[in-house]
Swiss-Prot record:
It holds the Pfam family 7tm_4. GO terms for biological process: G protein-coupled receptor signaling pathway; sensory perception of smell. It comes from Mus musculus. Gene3D superfamilies: Rhodopsin 7-helix transmembrane proteins (1.20.1070.10). Belongs to the G-protein coupled receptor 1 family. This is Olfactory receptor 10P22.
């Protein structure tokens, strides 16, 4: 497939993990297993938070939508990735690439905002318990979830507007396993200035700012926890927040390193491994850290099993 600098291209080649040779087979089965666990685990959380009245609180409302976004986020990437791992020359049509890019940005930014909303919910519950019902009214938590989805739509649309109008000729090899904005921009044959400005705007507004808000929320939570008189009280509060904090660090940490590395070092194997962590591994962790460390969720699971499996 030779490059023709005068011809508009109709598809991209996703280089992906082609340099891993025989390890691609192991990677295929590993990613497939992780994807199945992600779908089952997050679907279980959605089911539990809908079916059990004890989980009809703002915290689990956020968790349900977070699980839905995790399912959609991974599904945007993994099925195509699995098909490409079994292909000798993985290609993706231009329209499919832009569609993947749009939904990748949409669900990724929605996840960032939902994590921020969940941090605010924990802040309100732990630091302002007497005012929690006022701070986290039904209008507030539904509005925060709606705003998270809206932010994702704005992000995806912003990326799309800047990229869909660019011409692509000649080079068509994307050094990645998905269509992300920066690798695609590098292939455009026109100025990408506004595309990079748009990406910077989205990164600052929907990634850096949410991360700073989460850090501020947990700083306040930490101060409150240290002020609790009994060690049992501290342990309970730490247990409540540790699972959320784990997901936040894993997601924002790897994503930040991947996007903030120097351009000369980007789009190599290290960048792809980092992306693999926050797009594939993190969504799998969500149901485990929230269910195995949360007595209310495990209790709801037991009640659901008793009602439908062990009941009369």
């Amino acid at each position: 497939m030779g490059d023709d600098n005068d011809t508009d291209i109709t598809e991209f080649i996703l280089l992906g993990f082609s340099g891993y040779g025989f390890l691609q087979g192991h990677l295929f089965w590993g990613v497939l297993c992780i994807y199945v666990v992600t779908l089952l685990g997050n679907s279980l959380i959605v089911l539990l938070t809908l079916a059990d009245s004890a989980l009809h609180s703002p915290m689990y409302f956020f968790l349900r939508h977070f699980s839905v976004v995790e399912i959609l986020y991974t599904t945007t990437i993994v099925p195509r990735m699995l098909a490409d791992l079994r292909s000798s020359c993985p290609t993706i049509p231009l329209a499919s690439c832009f569609t993947q890019l749009y939904f990748f940005a949409l669900f990724g930014i929605a996840e960032c905002c939902l994590l921020t909303a969940m941090a605010y919910d924990r802040y309100a519950a732990i630091c302002c318990p007497l005012h929690y019902t006022t701070l986290m009214s039904q209008g507030t938590y539904t509005g925060l979830v709606g705003a998270s989805y809206l932010a994702g739509v704005i992000s995806g649309t912003t990326h799309s507007i800047f990229i869909f109008t660019l011409p692509f000729r000649g080079a068509k090899t994307i050094h990645h396993f998905l269509c992300d904005i920066l690798p695609v921009l590098r292939l455009a044959t026109a100025s990408t200035f506004w595309g990079e400005v748009g990406n910077l705007f989205v990164t600052i507004t929907f990634i850096f700012v949410p991360f700073l808000l989460i850090v501020a929320s947990y700083a306040c939570i930490l101060v409150t926890i240290l002020g609790v008189a009994t060690s049992q009280g501290r342990q309970k509060l730490f247990s409540t927040c540790s699972s959320h904090l784990f997901v936040v660090i894993l997601f924002f940490g790897t994503a930040t390193v991947a996007y903030m590395r120097p351009q000369a070092d980007s789009f190599g194997n290290t960048d792809q491994i980092l992306t693999l962590v926050y797009t594939v591994v993190t969504p799998m962790c969500n149901p485990f850290v929230y269910s195995l460390r949360n007595k209310e969720v495990t209790g709801a699971m037991r009640r659901l099993m008793k009602r439908y499996l062990w009941g009369p």
